[in-house]
A protein has these predicted regions:
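Polybasic/polar functional segments that serve as interface/processing modules
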Residues: 1-115
Length: 115
């Protein structure tokens, strides 16, 4: 995963988004629906209707980057549409992209002894 620079916020657009959208239409959605500046350097995440596809748009100061991830199994856990827009930490973004519940991450069990 590409590391998120310090001070960059990660925004989740609640609800579902048409995953056919590209740079221009996702940037417009950031402006009009989320009421944020798509050129500010923050990451904006969008999830498709089925929940297994995620797009992240980010302007790094030189140009726009569009990242896409599709889960082979399962769905990305997403906030309810009533929340409008949610901000998460870069660590929570790592959990989200791994398919882990970013709201309540739990340590996985590790054996303490052999045998």
């Amino acid at each position: 995963m590409i590391s998120v620079p310090t001070g960059v916020r990660v925004w989740l657009a609640t609800g579902h988004t048409d995953m056919r959208k590209g740079f221009a239409s996702l940037s417009l959605q950031v402006q009009e629906v989320l009421r944020r500046d798509p050129l500010c350097g923050h990451l904006f995440c969008f999830r498709g209707r089925r929940g297994n596809l995620l797009k992240v748009i980010w302007h790094d100061g030189q140009g726009a980057c569009l990242f896409t991830k599709r889960l082979e199994r399962g769905r990305f856990l997403w906030p309810s549409p009533a929340d409008d827009v949610v901000t998460i930490s870069s660590a929570q973004l790592g959990y989200l992209l791994s398919g882990i519940d970013w709201r309540h991450p739990q340590e996985t069990w590790r054996p303490t002894s052999v045998g």
